[in-house]
Regions:
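Active-site beta->alpha N-cap acidic-glycine motif
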Residues: 1-28
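C-terminal active-site subregion of NodB/CE4 polysaccharide deacetylases
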Residues: 19-26, 30, 36-132
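Short, histidine-centered active-site or binding-site loop motifs used for metal coordination
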Residues: 4-6, 35-38
Length: 132
């Protein structure tokens, strides 16, 4: 899943709208929302709604299909923000952490590892391969 920061992609040139559509249409990659500006925790409810629901709307308009996954900026969340993400129509949301997902995990606080543009595949494999 590629989690897209809707405004940053346009402003900072990470991916063009055409690139986002192309990877989505490939069927190999799902597109999820990562807010409009990568800010969230410091905002009040109205601005958080614009970030959470607005990013979903922007991406769904671009792609012409539902965006069902959300990733919290910096992996940070609260119970209040979790409720707002759920109310915005997402099916699941992710935070950062190596913990195992189990039956008591909430769909709106699933853990994933963070992969950035500076991470190399061999290093990730070494880091996350269980030790013998």
């Amino acid at each position: 899943t590629f989690f897209i920061i809707a405004d940053n992609n346009i402003l900072n040139g990470y991916m063009t709208n055409d690139m986002i559509k192309e990877v989505s249409e490939s069927g190999l990659v799902n597109i999820g929302s990562h807010t409009r500006s990568h800010m969230l925790m410091q905002y009040g409810k109205l601005r958080r709604d614009q970030e959470i629901a607005g990013s979903k709307f922007d991406l769904e308009t671009l792609l012409g299909k539902p965006v069902t996954a959300f990733a919290y900026p910096y992996g940070a969340m609260s119970k209040t923000i979790e409720k707002e993400v759920k109310a915005s129509g997402y099916d699941l949301a992710f935070r950062i952490g190596p913990e195992v997902i189990h039956t008591s995990s909430t769909r709106y606080g699933l853990r994933r590892i963070q992969v950035t543009q500076t991470d190399a595949i061999p290093g990730l494999i070494k880091t996350y391969t269980p030790k013998k």
